[in-house]
């Protein structure tokens, strides 16, 4: 076979191969090889004129290659100088073209190829097409709206590499070249004209162009488009958004290899916000817990529904129970019709309450509240001329006439303020602190915007099964977290240490936890603050335990467990039974004075259940224990004196004794020192116990006179020593008697003198 014929066959095949490679994703090495082949083709001579109908000619660059134009006319035996003076027709095809060339099968096949890809943005609504030239005709610019041109151009034997970032796009039935890849991709995916009438003719089906369909980023994806993504400070940026498998990927550009954002759809909640007077776009909001991680804007409702459909399919569980499909990713669809919301306004009361889901997502409730505010649009004109708070008050006043009086609404906010189970706390919402009025009721923590507005709540958390953990960094020492299954449900912050301790004690009781405030781990606080928190937490813990309804009928005395109560309690005397009978009679009448307040103490909590006789018995028990410890302390002190005296004598004997008995004496001295050390440790333990007993005795005596008690110390005379220590006086005790308060023995007061006791206290503080 002749070499020239082989070359004539090889050049078109190479040109076709390069045109196919333009539509493929190539590596860098392959791309370099392709450019090398293109440069070799550039050095070769142009093809004969019979193959011109197959090639694409970029007529915008014909002025730079007259030699190539002259070669085109060699086959037609025509002089180019005779054609230069002829006028040009810009909008019509050449009439002198031969019908054989016009009807050639190569031209018909070339019409099915994709349009050319110019280096510069072409004018709108037309592209350039090269046609074979007949004798006596010059090259012309031909505008067309219904045809397609071949795929590549060769100018002066030069192979032009098309830029894949300028895809061809067919919009509204017209084919044009786009120089913006994001506009091309988004518009080629679907029509964004959402305001067109339904009576119009249906638009042609939009398909992905071949250049974009072959992109590496959108391969094997469920859906993809260029969507607007909301940035941190409210700006919008167009990014390539792709859903592949169960993940949503965002690319800043179609040329990126790695996604800018990767989001797992099975761990997100999606909220669809339709376009209305407040929202200028159709939005899809993706949230994880209480954090908004992504906001995408769509240009039509149909596009939003299509994306939601794909998200439901992706989030669908592998196997549902009894054929019921429950998506792992809850998609919250809002009400789309405003008329429907206005009609519900006439039937339901006008309130600001928002339903709370299981995940207690503050963001989801806020969005639902925003969408539900469409029900108040009947007062839009009235609200437009005043502040938002004033409009809310007017709405609430109008809503009062629609509401029925409930039993819970009879309680005013003033009575709520007196209950220690409520107060102001700072709540962390969307990485910002907001002050909320918090209230505990029925094992649920309610959050209100104001203490005057108790009819509605912003959020509510069921506390059963939750845990509380103090600490949220060194900048927030009084903050604590509520956890459910080791995940944060809410982060709260108190104003001071006492307030923090009070809330910790109340929350522990409402959660049903067996952990006490002392057992919690506190960070970022000093010793004094820790003592204040634990003390307040202990008091509130005991108070909340006493207020729990553990009996089917109400009782006057609180059922508070004593912190170290013995199993065997002494028998209550007749006076206590009389008091108990009197209290039961008062229970039948159900007349309890709500203004009577009792200050509770942690160590003498049982006196509120058994009255003043219980406090008296506790005080006498502490007196007996105190005297017992003092006797043991005196015994140990006497033994220590004897041991030290014996050790002193042995040391004197060592100095004066010969060498034979020295070793035995040293061993005896070592034994005595060990005994002295053990006795000293025992004495220190007794000192600490004695201090604790004296403090409890003082607390019980401080509560006793408030109930009309008077406890005298045990006399040390021989005649009264044989009397029972815990006998109850037969005569009734005086109430609020100042003279009885002055009869307290000075021996009851704890003595803080002595260096040993001082050292023991310091050692105990360091140990804790």
Swiss-Prot record:
Q: List the biased-composition ranges (Polar residues).
A: 710-729
Occurrences of domain PH (ranges): 220-316, 418-512
Asked if the Swiss-Prot or TrEMBL record annotates the protein with the keyword Plastid, the reply is no
Any one GO cellular component localisation term in the record: anchoring junction
- Principal location listed in the UniProt entry: cytoplasm
Functional summary from the UniProt entry: May be involved in podosome and invadosome formation.
Name-wise, this protein is Actin filament-associated protein 1-like 1
Upper lineage is:
Eukaryota, Metazoa, Chordata, Craniata, Vertebrata
